[in-house]
Amino acid sequence: MAKKSMIARDVKRKKMAERYAAKRSALMAAFNSAADPMSRLEIHRKIQALPRNSAPTRIRNRCWATGKPRGVYRDFGLCRNQLRERAHKGELPGVVKSSW
C-alpha cells in the first residue's frame, strides 16, 4: 500500500491538470503556430507561469486498489499483484487463464 500522502498528491495533480487543460492546450497551440521568435518567447513564459502540477506529465499511473505506482496495467488500472489475485477469484470479467 502506498503512502496516503502520495496518493493524495497524485489526486491533487489530476484535479489541477483537468482545471488547466484548456488553457494549457490553447497556449501550446499558439506556441506551435507562432512564427515570430519574440511572440514564441512570450507564450513560452505564459506556459511556464502555469502551476507545475497542472502539467499532465506529472501525473503518476497508480493502482486504484492499493495506490502502488509500479507494475500498473492500464487496461485494468490495477497493479500486477491485484490483477493476479482478482483474476484468480474471477472478479475481472473476460479474463481467462491462458493454456496452450
Curated annotation (Swiss-Prot):
Q: Which family does it belong to?
A: Belongs to the universal ribosomal protein uS14 family.
Q: Which Gene3D superfamilies match?
A: 1.10.287.1480
- Which Pfam families does the entry link to? Ribosomal_S14
> Which GO molecular function annotations are given, in alphabetical order?
rRNA binding; structural constituent of ribosome
InterPro entries from the UniProt entry: Ribosomal_uS14, Ribosomal_uS14_bac/plastid, Ribosomal_uS14_CS
Protein name (record): Small ribosomal subunit protein uS14
- What organism, scientifically named, is this protein from? Synechococcus sp. (strain CC9902)
**Its biological purpose:** Binds 16S rRNA, required for the assembly of 30S particles and may also be responsible for determining the conformation of the 16S rRNA at the A site.
Task: Write the record's keywords in alphabetical order, separated by commas.
Answer: Ribonucleoprotein, Ribosomal protein, RNA-binding, rRNA-binding
Give me the Gene Ontology terms describing cellular component. Answer: cytoplasm; small ribosomal subunit
Q: Please give the subunit comment from the record.
A: Part of the 30S ribosomal subunit. Contacts proteins S3 and S10.
Q: Which domain of life is it from?
A: Bacteria
Query: Per the UniProt entry, what is one GO biological process?
Result: translation
